């Protein structure tokens, strides 16, 4: 029988961070993470512990940081060999959007375009109030809101310009090739879909989803601006198997704001995987998972692992809520 996403999605998915250093707090903690998880053994022992104890079955992998991501994949493979059990893989894959022969997936103008759309959607005051309370966003801005890209300091893409967006499929093939030897269960094209949805390029979205479906049975998508993007994708009948999006009670990285994301998540019929439930380590314990599983009625959640002690505490909290 062919597997469907509903039949294979577990309640808990083991996320990549902080094994690539990312703490969502500050550079000093990032450095400590890099030192703490500097080799495959330091990572695989955590996986071995939690899989044996809690029977977790799915892990996220990535390609954006080749050296550390390759080490992470090796740690998963070593774990599989030790425990004699297959770990299902959910692979993040960046979608390389091009404009004027340059990759713009995370360009300043792309950020400005998203800022402009978010602001127009909920209003300037609400949006600014959300942004300046978002500690993960501040971390992404290297701790300084002066680095924030807005539609005031950077020109958003116009509708006419967006008509010239393309997808670089040769580069996309390279990204997929990074996972050679991995048996990927779920492909997760990145939140570049936000830019394409907001600029109305649903033709490109359908095009690359069809491309990925030829290679992977299950294709979901990351979404960072779920309050706008999810309704747009559904209005335009985008054939996607589910969404992976930030969901935490503090509303961090939930754009345009927490309320719009909650509405979108509650009103889709597609499976949703919540991520960043702990708000980058700022909202811990059972309360984090009560928000995801009880309030939002989401059935699957991706969380950051960390050390054995950290992972143990997080999983216990989640299971207390799930039970």
What are these regions (language model features)?
Residues 67-69, 95-99, 160-170, 176-183, ...:
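Beta/alpha (TIM)-barrel catalytic core signal, keyed to glycine-rich beta->alpha loops juxtaposed to Asp/Glu
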Residues 74-79, 104-108, 316-318:
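Short, aromatic/basic amphipathic alpha-helical patches
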């Amino acid at each position: 029988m062919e597997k469907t996403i509903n039949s294979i999605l577990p309640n808990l998915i083991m996320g990549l961070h902080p094994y690539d250093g990312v703490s969502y707090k500050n550079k000093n903690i990032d450095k400590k993470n890099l030192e703490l998880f500097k080799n495959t053994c330091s990572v695989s022992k955590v996986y071995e512990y939690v899989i044996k104890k809690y029977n977790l079955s799915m892990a996220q992998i990535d390609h954006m940081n080749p050296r550390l991501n390759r080490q992470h994949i090796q740690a998963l493979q070593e774990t599989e060999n030790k425990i004699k059990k297959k770990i299902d893989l959910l692979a993040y894959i960046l979608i390389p959007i091009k404009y004027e022969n340059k990759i713009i997936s995370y360009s300043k103008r792309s950020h400005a375009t998203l800022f402009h759309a978010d602001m127009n959607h909920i209003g300037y005051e609400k949006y600014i109030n959300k942004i300046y309370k978002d500690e993960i966003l501040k971390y992404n801005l290297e701790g300084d809101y002066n680095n924030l890209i807005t539609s005031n300091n950077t020109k958003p893409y116009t509708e006419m310009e967006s008509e010239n967006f393309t997808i670089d499929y040769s580069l996309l093939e390279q990204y997929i090739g990074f996972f050679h030897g991995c048996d990927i269960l779920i492909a997760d094209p990145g939140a570049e879909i936000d830019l394409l949805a907001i600029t109305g390029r649903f033709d490109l979205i359908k095009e690359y989803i069809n491309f990925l479906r030829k290679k992977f049975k299950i294709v979901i998508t990351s979404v960072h601006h779920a309050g706008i993007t999810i309704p747009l994708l559904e209005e335009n009948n985008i054939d996607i198997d589910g969404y992976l999006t930030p969901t935490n009670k503090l509303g961090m990285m939930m754009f345009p704001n927490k309320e719009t994301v909650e509405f979108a998540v509650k009103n889709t019929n597609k499976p949703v995987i919540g991520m960043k439930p702990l708000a980058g380590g700022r909202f811990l314990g059972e309360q984090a998972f009560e928000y995801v599983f009880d309030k939002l009625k989401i059935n699957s959640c991706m969380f950051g692992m960390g050390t054995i002690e950290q992972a143990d505490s997080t999983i216990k909290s989640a299971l207390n809520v799930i039970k």
